[in-house]
């Protein structure tokens, strides 16, 4: 009997020890290991760089994107009282500073201010965004043209800060090559968490302080960019003469033109431009419908914000799916199937507008949450292989500037799609109070998504492990080319269609 009791006690002790080790393992995975990782990055890269990444990617881009998207929709609808077709056009205008990102990149690389190439541009970006947001917050009955100017200026501030922190990240990647992947993960993590928090809080904040009050909060977050510029550790650099700066701009243009003469480069670029341009955006029409339509769900501000937060979660799931299961498949195959699913997901809006979901017993909120989650997940899966492909199209010596140019081409496509969606909404007479033809807008939008499927032959049928450019473009350096040190860290950051 004594032996049996000792054996039972020994088994209980072993079971308890196993459970304790399991709990310690979970605690180490969830808390201790991430904290050790963050501490390592701070010690290796300097705290000011770490602070800059959190502010730019997490606060300015992530949190700011979530707050500004919802507040701008309500600002156009409630303060400016414009039609959904107009709002769709103006949303496209706000993105123009992102189209000229290569210009900001060249400025930060070749035009130092007072001997510094990074810190002054953070300060400029912060003041530009802060002043524009404060004007929107404090000014009553602001004229539409001035309001648009402020929104564009705020967008420019975020874009300049984005380009500048990209340069800092790449500089650290050069000096600490073993930490390059860790830095990209840090950037993406900050942006994703910031976006999720921003969208989750946006509806509540718009309800409590109004859309203009949210702009006041965004002005405060923009002020943090000024702090980044003041505390960032940077060594002074030699100022360049005006002639030398002009020569570098001319050399950059010549090198870019030469690169675009390769079919391996211009064909994927043409696909990115056309596929984005024909995928019309009708977000503002849908927003007006599910907030103002008598036959619609009449969602509150809080509900709108929470719906968009599920879109951010869908983007994260899309990233995880691609990174873990799809990244080794050929680019063309992944994009083809993502485009096919995108066509089908477009008709989910039709089911909602025709109220078929209610006949099936599916509540509006549940159905829209699923729609938002699925559409953002598919959009992210479609976009990631194009991002990886773009990184392989950049010739040696000008990777940063050329990558920014490729991203600008995609932004041009999104601008065309936003304006095209506005024209379609206007042509079919979808207004603040009339939504009779919204179903037809959705059908046309969804059918146009078929066009890029017929253009996938422009994408090279290779995977992420393949080399696309000729060897001489990968090994040679541009003798008098652009002194760029900037490779985009946008795998988890870029906005979506």
UniProtKB/Swiss-Prot annotation:
It is found in: Membrane. Pfam families: BT1. InterPro entries: BT1 (IPR039309), FBT (IPR004324), MFS_trans_sf (IPR036259). One of its GO terms (cellular component) is membrane. It is a multi-pass membrane protein. It comes from the Eukaryota. The chain crosses the membrane at residues 40-60, 87-107, 120-140, 145-165, 186-206, 212-232, 269-289, 302-322, 334-354, 358-378, 405-425, 439-459. Keywords: Membrane, Transmembrane, Transmembrane helix, Transport. Belongs to the major facilitator superfamily. Folate-biopterin transporter (TC 2.A.71) family. Could mediate folate transport. This is Probable folate-biopterin transporter 3.
């Amino acid at each position: 009997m004594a032996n049996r009791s000792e054996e039972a006690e020994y088994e209980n002790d072993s079971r308890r020890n196993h459970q304790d080790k399991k709990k310690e393992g979970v605690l180490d995975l969830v808390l201790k290991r991430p904290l050790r990782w963050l501490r390592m990055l701070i010690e290796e890269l300097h705290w000011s760089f770490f602070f800059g990444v959190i502010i730019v990617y997490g606060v300015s881009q992530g949190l700011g994107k979530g707050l500004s998207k919802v507040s701008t929709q309500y600002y156009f609808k409630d303060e400016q009282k414009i039609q959904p077709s107009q709002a769709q056009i103006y949303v496209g205008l706000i993105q123009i500073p992102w189209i000229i990102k290569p210009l900001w990149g060249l400025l930060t690389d070749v035009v130092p201010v007072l001997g510094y190439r990074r810190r002054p541009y953070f300060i400029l970006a912060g003041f530009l965004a802060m002043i524009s947001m404060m004007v929107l917050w404090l000014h009553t009955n602001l004229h539409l043209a001035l309001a648009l100017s402020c929104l564009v200026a705020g967008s420019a501030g975020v874009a300049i800060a984005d380009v500048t922190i990209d340069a800092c990240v790449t500089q650290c990647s050069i000096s600490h090559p073993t930490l390059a992947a860790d830095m990209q993960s840090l950037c993406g993590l900050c942006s994703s968490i910031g976006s999720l928090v921003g969208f989750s809080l946006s509806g509540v904040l718009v309800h409590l302080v109004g859309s203009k009050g949210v702009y006041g909060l965004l002005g405060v977050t923009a002020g943090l960019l000024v702090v980044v510029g003041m505390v960032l550790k940077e060594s002074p650099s030699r100022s360049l003469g005006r002639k030398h700066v002009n020569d570098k701009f001319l050399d950059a243009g010549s090198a870019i033109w030469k690169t675009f003469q390769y079919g391996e480069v211009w064909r994927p670029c043409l696909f990115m431009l056309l596929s984005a341009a024909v995928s019309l955006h009708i977000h503002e029409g849908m927003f007006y419908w599910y907030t103002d339509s008598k036959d619609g769900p009449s969602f509150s501000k809080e509900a709108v914000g929470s719906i968009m937060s599920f879109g951010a979660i869908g983007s994260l799931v899309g990233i995880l799916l691609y990174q873990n299961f799809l990244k080794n498949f050929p680019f063309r195959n992944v994009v083809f199937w993502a485009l096919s699913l995108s066509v089908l997901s477009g008709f989910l809006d039709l089911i909602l507008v025709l109220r078929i979901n209610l006949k099936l017993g599916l509540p509006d909120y549940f159905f829209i949450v699923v729609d938002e989650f699925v559409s953002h997940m598919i959009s992210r899966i479609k976009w990631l292989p194009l991002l990886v492909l773009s990184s392989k199209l950049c010739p040696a010596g000008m990777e940063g500037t050329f990558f920014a140019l490729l991203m600008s081409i995609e932004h041009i496509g999104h601008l065309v799609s936003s304006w095209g969606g506005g024209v379609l909404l206007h042509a079919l007479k979808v207004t603040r109070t009339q939504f009779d033809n919204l179903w037809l807008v959705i059908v046309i939008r969804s059918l146009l998504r078929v066009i890029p499927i017929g253009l996938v032959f422009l994408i090279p049928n290779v995977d992420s492990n393949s080399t696309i450019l000729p060897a001489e473009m990968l090994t040679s350096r541009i003798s008098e080319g652009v002194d760029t040190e900037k490779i985009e860290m946008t795998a988890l950051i870029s906005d979506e269609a």
